[in-house]
């Protein structure tokens, strides 16, 4: 009985020690996070920091993109930030928004589920700053700043799908509405005809349309129409995006790699050599070529030796450039590696004096 008691005491001691260490470590992490945001606050321009309440914790800044004539929404930075969100995501918290600049103006009528919501973003809203304040049920407050910037959405985004790539999962088409959340629903059209989401040929998950059992006939124009409700006037707002889908037959992804075995150079002069991949695939960017130095490191845009990649019409080339050949390069062997999802090939070339 005494032995069991001693074992239990030792066990309890070690468990307590581990809990104490973990608690101490957690406190250190929290303190480091707070210090990080305090330092960020210190770097703010005076014209921004003057709007902050000195009694509130600072929770960072965010830059959000917006599209003219479309809805725009933004979360308060401490709720969106991965370091702080677990502290401040709580349905009982209150989030207030203000527009700041020359003056400050409350925006409580432009709030949806705690997020800033602008139903029709105009050029007058561009580059504006917004201050949000999260008030917890304990009365603590934390503030963040959001800046909005205009970005014009692409009119129609081309997308290519090759049969046999991942047919059992289907083709995923993403409706690229990234400027506003809280939409009601999304309807999809193919070639101006509404798609019936029957969960057989077509299914829908959030912003994605999934086309099952892909076929060449699935090529076409796909439009997604996103429906919103305005906070104030309850009018339906519709925003659209477009994809041009081209379904192609399964391709032959084999390719031929071409490279001279020697680089003839002259000391003190520049030199270059090109490694070429010739593909029969319709996917012109199917093959990627990389150069490796004698130590096996990839060569990028270094000062003395660098590589430039080009691709056109099924031919991919990577040219290795020597800015100024010195004796240390003589005898070095460089590897050209061509690869795609299916195949990989390598060839080598050696630097020799002419």
From Swiss-Prot:
Domain Ig-like V-type: 249-348
Induction: Expressed in the early phase of the viral replicative cycle.
Signal peptide boundaries: 1-22
UniProt KW Glycoprotein keyword: yes
Subcellular location: Secreted
GO cellular component, one term: extracellular region
Cysteines joined through disulfide linkages: 76-132, 175-224, 275-336
InterPro entries, sorted: Ig-like_dom, Ig-like_dom_sf, Ig-like_fold, Ig_sub, IL-1_rcpt_fam
Membrane-spanning intervals of the chain: none
Origin superkingdom: Viruses
Pfam families reported in the protein's UniProt record: Ig_2 (PF13895)
Location of the Ig-like C2-type domain: 68-150, 158-240
Family: Belongs to the interleukin-1 receptor family.
Subunit text: Interacts with host IFNA1.
Function in brief: Counteracts the antiviral effects of host IFN-alpha/beta and key IFN-inducible proteins involved in viral RNA degradation suxh as host OAS1. Acts as a soluble IFN-alpha receptor and thus inhibits the interaction between host IFN-alpha and its receptor.
Name of the featured protein: Soluble interferon alpha/beta receptor OPG204
Gene: OPG204
